[in-house]
């Protein structure tokens, strides 16, 4: 005989918890989502929620006053759950939602007065009958679909990656928008392509097989990445951390070499089997074979796509009908951008304090809709390298630039257009996901579409033209029939959630009509039920005045609470003789008595029955409405794609007009010619006019520009400016310049700045050399290379030798010959112009006025003659005594050697063997003995302009220390 009796609800909770052992389980209890046991302790700490307790069992072995057992409990109101779940997901947790399967069934089982449901309240557990619950979805970082939990203007991708014998299968999807795509990489660049794609997508979650042979060290799951951290713990301590704490610590344990910042999840190997994934995809997409969608002959892409689809189905607990079409793509039509280049060019995020505000997308994103913003973001992160689609896009932007009124009108029509893409995808999943709010947003968007179409009617053929060969043009269908259906079905201002309507109360005179989901007249059954039941509500509404008049008790009032339902309240000061005999006492208060009557209970029952039926009927009608929209989903998605493109194109046109951008001429050769180009981001932040600069590169005469000049003169800005103008041209945008001719590039490589990678034990110089090696190995003649101060992380001569060798390799190697900008402080490299025919010298100009340096920010032909390092040190706030001493040393050193001309740079000095002075302390060098001495000769040969600012400061500090000793 069991001595511990678990309550029925707790047995149900334990069973559901076993289904979602690796997730926090939110268990619906009436108006709250509750958590219990370890989950409760966790969220109480994480979310600052009060930790309480709830009786879950009786232990009859204990004394009677100690038999009740309590479980820790913490919960949140159902209407605020999105905020709490968002925070948990952001911390890396998985959240399982256990809902009551049938609200009306729960109502029927509830022992409270049935009148509580007339006010729209949800049920609680009864002691006799248990409400059935089930996990309706598991929310993970990559499967979020609720708009309240997602950023409006960015995608939330779930990705799946499988690697086998150097070949890669990749699939990704956004469950909130319905985007679903797959690719397979099989050549020698497969891993490089995967890394670039993961950098582009920035998935919130990446699925990998639970077999180490089929995944990369760069994509280790959480458990593997934390194994080292957990190893020192005892078994009990490790178990105490699982399953939640290991997830919370995922970022601490994540490998710095990981190719994604998203959550990495293991998915069982059998889910990746080719036979399984093929069957799942064909069944879901209703295809006779995978050849129809382009997956035939791509087994790894098939396995990745099928595994992802199964994961989505399992977490959503249903068919993910929003994933209706799979796009198989090839990276050959797009520019691959590695993570370093994306970071260096600050496409989506700046490394500075301004973050996204100082990025390229902050300049270009003038879209009016969330759909357009997401599309423009994809364009920026995936530039085209084929001229035909670029010309189509560029021509559309040009039309909108020229047609001012059309551009202004369409942007006005698009303003405040709801995110119909995400709303439609929730509707596609039916009543388990869709809400009246989604229907309302779709209706509001459809109402605005005729104005959008009218504004650009004459331009639609250009705006919606097919970009890729073989693709049909986009179609703009205002879907008037769908709008008509929604107008007839939905009330003017429906509540956000089902079950919140009040159908039984008529509009008060001069007041607003109560909110309801379904419009009167749409469904005859609903209207008939409302008419038949409304007199019960009207009776209760009139009861107070009726009873006052009948009894003569002026203080009598009719009230309601959740415990007792409707009641008649009479002050205890009233003479008991005035109280009718048929009044049944229900509750005694300090100053009043509460009563019910048979008549009141009868009408209260009618009202409760009506509420039950109305909730069921409303859900049925809403599901029917979702079903009626299913045949129109493809039309609506096509219209959404058209709206997104029009919005993105209009945004680029608006930026072009406001920024005085020009239409670049696109070419297929290696010309890169820009006249008075400007940095699009820096220009926007300056209060004074930006100083433009020219560049003229090609593969025949001027392939490599060596750019010298002082720090702060604008070299790095110019390098990024050229790369950004090129990238902008290859998304179809106009560019910030007076004129531009852009020979399309297949890749942009940047080596700008570096820092120690402490987590992987790599120094600044190692990081720099690794990145340089990658670009030298991966570049092609059509690439654009941007190099800034290669070799600065090591000794002067080592760095100079490496820098020169890199330039020679790019110039001479038959596989390369690509356009290159090479900024350097090694002035000796300007001699390469005489030795290599396709090298040209340029410098960022600066002049000295009244002892102060003025940076002109102008790119001029020829090499620089000075670095102005001491002036930069002064601007940085170096103490005046250090600046004075450095100036004296520089003057002395410059006086000991003949001046050099930029046109005739001296060869690097030969190494000097410096003998040691044998002292009791070992070898000691004298830096300040001005008598002829090998150390002095060494100093005379030292060239200050060759030093980076950091190296110069280190030398100065050492000199100052030695001077103080002497």
Swiss-Prot record:
Gene3D superfamilies: 1.10.1420.10, DNA repair protein MutS, domain I (3.40.1170.10), MutS, connector domain (3.30.420.110), P-loop containing nucleotide triphosphate hydrolases (3.40.50.300)
Coiled coil (residue ranges): none
One GO MF term attached to the UniProt entry: damaged DNA binding
Binding site for ATP: 709-716
GO cellular component terms, A-Z: cytosol
Function in brief: This protein is involved in the repair of mismatches in DNA. It is possible that it carries out the mismatch recognition step. This protein has a weak ATPase activity.
Record-stated family: Belongs to the DNA mismatch repair MutS family.
Name assigned to this protein: DNA mismatch repair protein MutS
Native organism: Chloroflexus aurantiacus (strain ATCC 29366 / DSM 635 / J-10-fl)
Protein's gene: mutS
């Amino acid at each position: 005989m069991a001595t511990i009796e678990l309550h029925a609800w707790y047995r149900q909770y334990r069973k559901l918890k076993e289904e979602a052992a690796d997730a926090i389980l939110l268990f619906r209890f009436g108006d709250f989502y509750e958590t219990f046991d370890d989950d409760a302790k966790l969220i109480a700490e994480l979310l600052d929620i009060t930790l309480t307790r709830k009786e879950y069992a009786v232990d009859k072995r204990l004394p009677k006053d100690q038999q009740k057992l309590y479980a820790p409990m913490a919960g949140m109101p159902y209407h605020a759950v999105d905020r709490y779940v968002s925070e948990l997901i952001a911390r890396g947790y998985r959240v399982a939602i256990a809902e009551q399967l049938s609200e009306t069934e729960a109502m029927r089982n509830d022992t409270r007065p049935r009148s509580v449901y007339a006010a729209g309240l949800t049920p609680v557990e009864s002691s006799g009958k248990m409400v059935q619950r089930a996990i309706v979805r598991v929310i993970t970082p990559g499967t979020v679909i609720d708009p309240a939990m997602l950023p409006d203007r960015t995608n939330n991708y779930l990705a799946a990656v499988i690697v086998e014998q150097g070949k890669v299968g990749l699939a990704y999807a956004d469950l909130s928008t319905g985007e679903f795509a797959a690719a397979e990489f099989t050549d020698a660049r497969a891993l490089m392509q995967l890394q670039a794609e993961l950098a582009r997508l920035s998935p919130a979650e990446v699925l990998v097989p639970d077999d180490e042979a089929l995944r990369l060290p760069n994509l280790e799951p959480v458990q593997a990445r934390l194994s080292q951290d957990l190893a020192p713990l005892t078994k009990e301590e490790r178990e105490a951390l699982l399953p939640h704490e290991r997830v919370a610590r995922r970022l601490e344990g994540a490998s710095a070499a990981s190719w994604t910042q998203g959550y990495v999840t293991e998915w069982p190997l059998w889910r990746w089997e080719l036979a399984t994934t093929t069957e799942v995809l064909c069944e879901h997409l209703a295809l006779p074979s995978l050849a129809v969608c382009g997956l035939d002959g791509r087994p790894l892409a098939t396995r990745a796509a099928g595994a992802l689809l199964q994961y989505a189905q399992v977490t959503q607990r249903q068919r993910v009908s929003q994933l209706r079409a799979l796009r198989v793509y090839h990276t050959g039509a797009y520019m691959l951008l590695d993570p370093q280049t994306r970071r260096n060019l600050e496409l989506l995020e700046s490394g500075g304090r301004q973050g996204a505000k100082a990025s390229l997308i902050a300049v270009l994103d003038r879209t009016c809709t969330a759909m357009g913003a997401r599309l423009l973001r994809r364009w920026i992160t995936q530039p085209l390298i084929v001229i035909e689609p670029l010309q189509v896009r560029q021509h559309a932007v040009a039309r909108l630039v020229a047609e001012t009124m059309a551009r202004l009108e369409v942007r006005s029509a698009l303003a405040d257009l709801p995110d119909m893409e995400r709303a439609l995808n929730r509707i596609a999943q039916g009543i388990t996901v869709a809400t009246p709010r989604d229907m309302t947003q779709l209706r509001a968007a459809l109402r605005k579409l005729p104005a959008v179409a009218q504004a650009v009617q004459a331009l639609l053929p250009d705006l919606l033209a097919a970009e890729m060969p073989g693709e049909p043009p986009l179609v703009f269908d205002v879907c008037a029939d769908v709008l008509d259906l929604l107008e007839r079905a939905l009330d003017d201002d429906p509540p956000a959630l089902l079950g919140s309507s009040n159908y039984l109360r008529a509009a008060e005179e001069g007041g607003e009509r109560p909110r309801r989901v379904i419009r009167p007249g749409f469904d005859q059954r609903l209207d008939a039920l409302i008419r038949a039941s409304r007199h019960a509500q009207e009776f209760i509404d009139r009861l107070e005045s009726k009873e006052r008049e009948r009894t003569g008790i002026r203080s009598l009032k009719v009230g309601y609470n959740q415990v007792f339902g409707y009641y008649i309240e009479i002050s205890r000061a009233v003479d008991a003789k005035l109280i009718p005999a048929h009044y049944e006492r229900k509750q005694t208060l300090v100053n009043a008595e509460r009563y019910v009557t048979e008549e009141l209970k009868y009408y209260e029952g009618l009202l409760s029955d009506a509420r039950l039926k109305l909730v069921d009927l409303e859900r049925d009608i809403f599901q029917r409405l979702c079903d009626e929209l299913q045949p129109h989903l493809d039309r609506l998605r096509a219209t959404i794609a058209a709206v997104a493109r029009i919005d993105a194109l209009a945004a680029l046109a608006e930026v072009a007009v406001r920024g005085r951008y020009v239409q670049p001429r696109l070419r297929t050769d290696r010309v890169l010619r820009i006249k008075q180009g400007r940095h699009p981001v820096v220009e926007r932040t300056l209060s004074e006019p930006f100083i433009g600069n020219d560049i003229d590169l090609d593969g025949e005469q001027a392939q490599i520009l060596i750019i010298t000049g002082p720090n702060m003169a604008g070299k790095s800005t110019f390098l990024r400016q050229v790369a950004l103008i090129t990238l902008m041209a290859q998304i179809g945008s106009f560019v910030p310049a007076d004129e531009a001719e852009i020979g399309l590039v297949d890749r942009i490589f940047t080596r700008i700045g570096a820092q120690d990678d402490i987590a992987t034990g790599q120094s600044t110089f190692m990081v720099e050399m690794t990145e340089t090696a990658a670009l030298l190995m991966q570049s092609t003649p059509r690439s654009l290379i941007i190099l800034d101060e290669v070799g600065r992380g090591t000794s002067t001569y080592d760095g100079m030798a490496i820098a020169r060798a890199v330039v020679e390799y790019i110039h001479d190697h038959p596989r390369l010959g690509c356009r290159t900008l090479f900024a350097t402080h090694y002035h000796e490299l300007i001699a390469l112009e005489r030795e290599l025919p396709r090298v040209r010298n340029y410098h960022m100009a600066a002049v000295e006025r009244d002892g102060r340096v003025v940076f002109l920010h102008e790119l001029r032909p020829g090499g620089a003659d000075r670095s102005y390092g001491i002036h930069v040190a002064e601007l940085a706030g170096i103490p005046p005594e250090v600046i004075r001493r450095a100036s004296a040393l520089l003057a002395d050193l410059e006086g000991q050697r003949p001046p050099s001309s930029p046109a005739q740079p001296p060869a690097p000095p030969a190494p000097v063997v410096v003998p040691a002075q044998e002292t009791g302390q070992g070898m000691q060098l004298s830096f300040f003995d001005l008598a002829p001495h090998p150390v002095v000769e060494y100093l005379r040969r030292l060239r200050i302009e060759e030093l980076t600012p950091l190296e110069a400061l280190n030398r100065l500090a050492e000199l100052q220390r030695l001077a103080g000793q002497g």
